[in-house]
A protein has these predicted regions:
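Polybasic, glycine- and aromatic-enriched phosphate-binding surface used to engage nucleic acids
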Residues: 33, 43-265, 269
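Acidic/histidine-rich catalytic neighborhood
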Residues: 18-20, 284-285
Length: 332
């Protein structure tokens, strides 16, 4: 690759102007020494030119390599897995109104409802529930004709265990929830801790028994830069992946107890400030136009604590962070 324009927003003068995200790559079968990268601090602004020794497939001045799927994390960290999959054709999942209406006609079913969590529910504070029949009493089940009808409907296309979710992968402890999809407009992907009683839904991700340090690293600027360059997209929105993003992420090496404690304290501060806005959704809190100043400051302080875990170097911008991460990835 001789030169490259990193991602920018392209538009034309057509009446129905669609947003198109573009990269420009100039390459040949021979090498040159004077390579150039055109970087965009903002995808809607003009680029600035930077000389490069080598331009890799991620359009960064670094060695050539491809990040591929991994079944296990690159580093010694807790496994990230997907949540449970209903595979029920909409029979076992209920909105709050649907749940209340169902309980009115089937009162015995009330204790078998459990809250579930997908990205939409988590980010927008929308209650959603599942009819959870894993430990249902057979005698009670026979008394609930409307529940039996649901089971009969599911049995038509999934005969083996029609009263259960198709795939059950519920954490055994309180866990960290990571939505698969998040808007590219957000500076940070909203993630958070959930009680083990809440069922996480596939295709979203969980880390069972996660720590404040885990939360701090994954909600940091360093991790977001990795996400920005490595993860898949739907339109321009992030499409997170455990096998590509998390399992390949180069966590900081040789972190001291002092550094770790600093990350934990700053991470807790982010959670404390979020809890002050109990009437706001995460969509409200992480919209760049409405993000509270004290929450933004708390994230910036957390970013500094995580930066410090990656060494004493002062990282001026995200380009320096990603180049450092790619170098660390190769060391692992």
């Amino acid at each position: 690759i001789h030169f490259a324009h990193q991602t920018f927003n392209w538009s034309n003068e057509a009446k129905s102007n669609a947003a198109v995200y573009v990269v420009i790559i100039g390459f040949a079968s021979f090498d040159i020494t004077n390579k150039k990268i055109f970087e965009y601090e903002n995808i809607n602004e003009e680029p600035f030119e930077k000389e490069a020794k080598n331009i890799n497939p991620y359009l960064v001045d670094s060695n050539d390599f491809f990040i591929e799927k991994r079944s296990k994390p690159l580093c010694n960290v807790t496994k990230m897995q997907t949540g449970s999959r209903a595979n029920d054709q909409g029979k076992l999942l209920f909105s709050e109104d649907e749940k209340n209406e169902f309980i009115q006609k089937e009162p015995l079913s009330e204790k078998y409802f459990r809250q579930v969590m997908g990205a939409k529910e988590f980010i927008n504070s929308i209650p959603r529930f599942a009819l959870w029949l894993e430990d249902v009493n057979p005698s009670e089940l026979r008394q609930m004709k409307y529940v039996l009808q649901i089971i009969e409907d599911i049995k038509k296309f999934r005969d083996k265990t029609p009263h259960l979710f198709g795939s059950i992968r519920n954490p055994k402890h309180n866990y960290l929830f990571i939505p698969q999809m998040s808007s590219q407009r957000r500076e940070y992907i909203p993630i958070g801790f959930l009680n083990k009683s809440i069922i996480p839904l596939d295709p979203h991700f969980v880390i069972d028994k996660a720590t404040l340090y885990d939360f701090g690293i994954l909600t940091s600027k360093f991790h977001m830069v990795w996400v920005d360059y490595v993860c898949g997209r739907l339109k321009s929105d992030y499409r997170y992946s455990n096998s590509i993003v998390y399992n390949n992420y180069p966590f900081p090496k040789n972190v001291s107890e002092k550094q770790k404690k600093a990350v934990e304290e700053k991470a807790q501060n982010v959670l404390n400030i979020r809890s002050q806005f109990s009437d706001c959704s995460l969509a409200d809190l992480y919209d760049p136009l409405s993000m509270p100043p004290n929450l933004k400051k708390a994230h910036q302080e957390l970013d500094k604590a995580v930066d410090n875990c990656y060494g004493s170097k002062l990282f001026k911008n995200d380009k320096e962070r990603i180049e450092f991460l790619f170098g660390l990835y190769e060391e692992y």
